[in-house]
A protein has these predicted regions:
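Acidic glycine-/aspartate-rich tracts in secreted/extracellular proteins
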Residues: 62-64, 82-85, 138-141, 168
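Residue-level detector of buried hydrophobic side-chain packing
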Residues: 42, 55-57, 77, 114, ...
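Short loop/turn segments at connectors of secondary-structure elements within structured domains
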Residues: 51-53, 71, 129, 158
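Proprotein-processing/basic-patch segments
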Residues: 2-9, 22-24, 29-34, 125-174
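Conserved catalytic loop of SAM-dependent methyltransferase domains
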Residues: 7-14, 115
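A short beta-strand-loop element at or near the start of a globular domain
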Residues: 12-64
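Core residues of folded domains in eukaryotic genome-function proteins
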Residues: 38, 110, 158-160
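Beta-strand-rich interaction/scaffold domains
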Residues: 66-129
Length: 174
């Protein structure tokens, strides 16, 4: 098996209220009347689709989490159909594919790992163009938010990682 770790190249958190953070955290969820949605982009190397065993997004916790008792813990992740930029806001969000979503979520002490095998395979097979992913809370009617390191975090150990595990290939593909 070969494991490839790809660090996030771009990230963005948007909210229905102006954010005061300096791109150090991805925030996902809702607190009172404030909703947070985050975006990530990874520049993928050419990986043959038939060699991908699994792919997972590893997010590193950075601090404050607010999870009320009724908050559904699942994070919803979907592949983007359009690009995001620093001009993205709640009024002009990129479209995403609602049918394609993440797999299992594993909660650790310092990180959260989310299965993205279906999404990464769709990119590798050319079914979708990699324009990034959107992260939001599955149940926005409940209160709760999570904070993770972003692509712009000063601490490199907190940057989001896309980990792709491949079968060994007789030919190099990197």
């Amino acid at each position: 098996m070969i494991s490839i770790d790809i660090y996030a190249e771009k990230s963005l958190t948007i909210s229905n209220l102006p954010l005061t953070i300096k791109d150090n955290d991805l925030i996902i969820g809702r607190c009172l009347n404030i909703s947070y949605i985050s975006y990530l982009y990874f520049s993928l190397p050419p990986v043959p689709a038939n060699t991908i065993e699994n792919a997972s997004l590893v997010l590193f916790k950075t601090g404050t989490f607010l999870n009320c008792l009724k908050t559904k813990e699942a994070i919803a992740i979907h592949p983007l159909l359009d690009y995001f930029s620093s001009r993205t806001n709640m009024l002009n969000r990129p479209k995403y594919d609602p049918a394609l979503t993440q797999g299992d979520i594993t909660e650790g002490t310092v990180s959260t790992e989310i299965d993205l095998t279906a999404i990464v395979n769709s990119w590798a097979k050319g079914q979708l163009v990699n324009k990034g992913i959107v992260l939001s809370k599955e149940e926005q009617q409940y209160f709760g938010f999570s904070r993770y390191g972003s692509a712009y975090t000063k601490d490199p150990t907190l940057k989001p990682v896309l980990r792709i595990v491949c079968k060994e290939s007789p030919l190099p593909f990197l």
